[in-house]
């Protein structure tokens, strides 16, 4: 269409060649100088230029072409461009000014309206995505468009109710993940909050839902009161069961073995058992077997007499067993104790007597032992032979499992607020004790490999960064937590590919020709043929 016929028509875009701002004047001047004065500059050319400029800046700054590093660098950054400032939001989309232009006889556009402020992208749902059965379309819609950029819950199910995809909001609400089978009661629960439901002719279902009158979907604490065992509080049913066992164990002198990942709070639970026991007025002595050199563990545990070895203290020294007399000895990382010392430890537990290194005198002790490890001691016994079975069964009167923090999502809010309160007091009343819903949602979506110890460190960092703010916001959290939801599980991709293959096979069975099958699937005949070769679908499948 020539300028004569285009004149008077309107167009909406972020960029027009006639845009009168310094960045565009410089850009247009450079383009005409390089490609000629008659060059017409389109928005595609301007966008390409801006994109290359942003990526180049990232590469120069990072001195790396790693895709993930570049994406992380670009998040939440604002760049000047021929169309004005462009901001790359954390959801991968751009926000920038939008304008409406009216074409004139010169082939240019007169700007008749401008938003005058950045407009964020908001991808819209179409009605053809799911029915197309095309992997790229499904993946683009579910993961890139709606998955993690919305506070609404997004679920994709196959015809057997197996979850092919669940975003963090769906996980927070229903505690489900990819590969789980959605239960009927869970389906009823979301049916009252449905925003959109799509079902393809081959049974793939999409649900978009939200909870009424709430902001971001969070792991909400149950209505009942939390279970309290001393200083330990939980809303988690599994952990509550373990704490009830710990409460019973605290009223006896029986040995306790605490199992849990690093940073899950094993020593805190051991101290709580001691504080709730009849031995509460006695000493609580802790020893980490994994943090002491092998040659020193024996002297730390059992003590030594003067002259027992080179460098021995004059007058000797009592070991941890003697120091803990009348109280509790906590042996952390018991799985790291050298095999040769496990015999001596077993003897002390059985006889309730200790012999210092270099001595022959038996000293009676009255000690309750609580051991802890992050290892699977049964495997250490059965497959590696690095832990004695008789010692294991001596320690294992009561076994208490501490669930990892990733399985205690409902406790994250309580723990975070308690840490904030502690830091508020530690820093003499400075800082905030409040956590925004958006920040809490990110905390609940993160996997927490370092468990409670990592959470405490993250909260302390956020507290200090937000020292003058009214509440903790997502910007105060580390990048790995802010970007945690951007990670795409490989298994989800594989499941979607399996669904695509099954859909193609089903369509071929129900069709009389490739053309008919392609039409049912919403793809071209050539694309279908390529997919048949890609998935190695046998021709016998086609009727």
Swiss-Prot record:
Residues 232-464 form the Sigma-54 factor interaction domain. This is Limonene hydroxylase. ATP binds at residues 260-267, 324-333. It comes from Geobacillus stearothermophilus. One of its GO terms (biological process) is regulation of DNA-templated transcription. Keywords: ATP-binding, DNA-binding, FAD, Flavoprotein, NAD, NADP, Nucleotide-binding, Oxidoreductase, Transcription, Transcription regulation. It holds the Pfam family HTH_8. Gene3D superfamilies: 1.10.8.60, 3.40.50.2300, Homeodomain-like, P-loop containing nucleotide triphosphate hydrolases, PAS domain.
């Amino acid at each position: 269409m020539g300028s004569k016929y285009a004149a008077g028509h309107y167009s909406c875009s972020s960029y027009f060649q006639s845009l009168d701002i310094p960045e565009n004047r410089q850009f247009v001047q450079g383009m005409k100088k390089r490609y000629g004065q008659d060059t017409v500059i389109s928005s595609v050319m301007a966008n390409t230029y801006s994109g290359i400029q942003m990526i180049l800046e990232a590469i120069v700054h990072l001195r790396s072409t790693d895709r993930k590093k570049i994406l992380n660098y670009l998040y939440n950054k604002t760049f000047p461009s021929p169309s004005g400032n462009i901001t790359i939001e954390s959801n991968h989309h751009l926000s920038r000014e939008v304008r409406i232009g009216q074409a004139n006889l010169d082939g240019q556009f007169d700007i008749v309206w401008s938003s005058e402020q950045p407009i964020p992208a908001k991808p819209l749902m179409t009605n053809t995505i799911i029915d197309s059965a095309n992997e790229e379309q499904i993946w683009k819609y579910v993961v890139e468009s709606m998955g993690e950029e919305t506070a609404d819950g997004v679920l994709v199910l196959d015809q057997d109710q197996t979850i092919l995809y669940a975003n963090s909001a769906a996980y927070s609400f229903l505690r489900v993940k990819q590969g789980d089978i959605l239960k009927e009661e869970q389906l009823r629960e979301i049916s009252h909050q449905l925003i959109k439901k799509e079902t393809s002719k081959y049974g793939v279902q999409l649900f978009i839902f939200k909870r009424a009158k709430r902001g971001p979907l969070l792991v909400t604490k149950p209505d009942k009161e939390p279970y309290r065992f001393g200083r330990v509080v939980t809303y988690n049913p599994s952990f509550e069961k373990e704490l009830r066992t710990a409460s019973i164990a605290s009223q006896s002198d029986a040995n306790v073995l605490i199992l849990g990942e690093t940073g899950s709070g094993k020593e805190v639970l051991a101290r709580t058992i001691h504080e709730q026991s009849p031995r509460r007025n006695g000493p609580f002595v802790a020893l980490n077997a994994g943090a002491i050199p092998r040659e020193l563990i024996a002297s730390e545990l059992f003590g030594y007499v003067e002259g027992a070895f080179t460098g021995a203290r004059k007058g000797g020294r009592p070991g941890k067993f003697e120091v803990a007399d009348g109280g509790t000895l906590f042996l952390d990382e018991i799985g790291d104790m050298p095999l040769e010392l496990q015999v001596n430890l077993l003897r002390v537990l059985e006889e309730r007597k200790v012999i210092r290194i270099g001595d022959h005198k038996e000293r009676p002790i009255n000690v309750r032992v609580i051991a802890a490890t992050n290892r699977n001691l049964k495997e250490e016994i059965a497959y590696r032979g690095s832990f004695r079975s008789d010692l294991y069964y001596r320690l294992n009167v009561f076994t208490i499992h501490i669930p990892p923090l990733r399985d205690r999502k409902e406790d994250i809010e309580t723990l975070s607020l308690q840490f904030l309160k502690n830091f508020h007091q530690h820093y003499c009343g400075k800082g905030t004790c409040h956590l925004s819903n958006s920040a809490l949602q990110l905390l609940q979506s993160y996997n927490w490999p370092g468990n409670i110890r990592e959470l405490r460190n993250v909260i302390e960092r956020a507290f200090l960064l937000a020292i003058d703010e009214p509440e903790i916001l997502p910007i105060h959290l580390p990048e790995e937590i802010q970007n945690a939801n951007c990670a795409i599980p490989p298994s989800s991709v594989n499941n979607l590919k399996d669904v695509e293959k099954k859909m193609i096979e089903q369509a071929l069975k129900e069709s009389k020709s490739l053309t008919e099958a392609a039409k049912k699937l919403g793809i071209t005949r050539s694309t279908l043929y390529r997919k048949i070769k890609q998935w190695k679908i046998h021709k016998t499948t086609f009727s």
